[in-house]
Every structure is written in structure tokens, then in C-alpha cells.
Amino acid sequence: MHEEITGIILAGGRATRMGGEDKGLIQIAGIPLYQYVLSRLRPQVSLMAISANRNQARYGESGLPIVSDLTPDFSGPLAGMLAGLKHAATEWVVFVPCDVPDFPATLVDQLWQQKGSSLAAYASDGERAHPTLALLHTSLAPQLKEYLARGERKLMLFLDAAGARKIAFSGQQAAFHNLNTREDCLRWQQEKGLTNE
């Protein structure tokens, strides 16, 4: 477990493919999706928070701090990341989206061990980059704030500009599958053998 890293679950998106429903709160076997992500992250970091712009009371039932975007326009994962960097009391922050419940149990460890001297690192499955699963140093906050103020929204471009290191989790493509639709959620529930309470 990494005490020097705060873990932030990104749950602030619009969830257009879920019909605008708050993706992190979709129930799978009677448990909200974000709780599966939370239980995966909990052994990896000592401090956690949730980045959310809607239904904050429901996310607050987790007992974790809820962090709102500092920008009012739903400007994508980067806005949640900026809020997370400003919230954290630790120097480093790891981000995971609320819809990737199988992300590697070694995610934080590998990003931390392999970042080298970089101020940021993000996951790749060997074929595709997964920039929302990323480790960032809080000193990147001013640069990110400026980037968003210019109207920029592309996460990958920001990470490249920050000199982020890509960390490969080879052969773990399935670990990075995100649940975009209700059908995805149902399929995942069946794969895991989860039954409705």
C-alpha cells in the first residue's frame, strides 16, 4: 500500500452511452459500479476520494471525500484530475475511472515503480493507451489549469506535454475493459457470477 499517494475515482462524466445516467451509480448485483472500483483501489493506496459532479450525497455514502470540478462545463476527465490534484494532501495522485472494475491489482505499484523521474505515468495494455489510469505529481496542477483555461480538453496531449511515461501492462487487455452500456454491465456481472441480492 502506498501512503504517499492519494487515489481518486473519476466519476464526473456525462455518461452519454448510459442515457445520461450516472455511470458510477449503475447497480450491478445490488452494488453501485463505483464500489467495485473502490474495493479494487483500497488495498493499493491509503487515502482516497471521489471526483463527482452529480449525486454527491450518494457517492458520499462511501464515507470518502467528494471532490467537484473547479470548472463548470463538464470538461472531461482533466477537470476531475485538476480538482483531484488540488484536493490531495499527498504529493502524488493516482486516478482511475469509475467504469473499469477489473483494473490491475498492481496498477499503483507498477506506475510508481516504473515512472522513473517523470512527473506523470499512465497505463497501456500493450496495444492501447489508457490515460485515465494515471499517476500524476501535484506540481502539475498549474500547468493543467492553464491547459484547460486555453480550452484544451485532450487528456493524452496533456500527458505528452507533461512528459508522462507510458507503462505497459502487457497481456492484460481484459483488465482495462470499461463498462459503457447497461449490456456491458450485465455481461460483466454474468462473467463474475454475481447474483442480485
UniProtKB/Swiss-Prot annotation:
It comes from the Bacteria. One of its GO terms (biological process) is bis(molybdopterin guanine dinucleotide)molybdenum biosynthetic process. Gene3D superfamilies: Spore Coat Polysaccharide Biosynthesis Protein SpsA, Chain A. Its cofactor is Mg(2+). Mg(2+) binds at D99. It is found in: Cytoplasm. Keywords: Cytoplasm, GTP-binding, Magnesium, Metal-binding, Molybdenum cofactor biosynthesis, Nucleotide-binding, Transferase. CDD domains: MobA. One of its GO terms (molecular function) is metal ion binding. Disulfide bonds: none annotated. Transfers a GMP moiety from GTP to Mo-molybdopterin (Mo-MPT) cofactor (Moco or molybdenum cofactor) to form Mo-molybdopterin guanine dinucleotide (Mo-MGD) cofactor. This is Molybdenum cofactor guanylyltransferase. It comes from Serratia proteamaculans (strain 568). The gene is mobA.
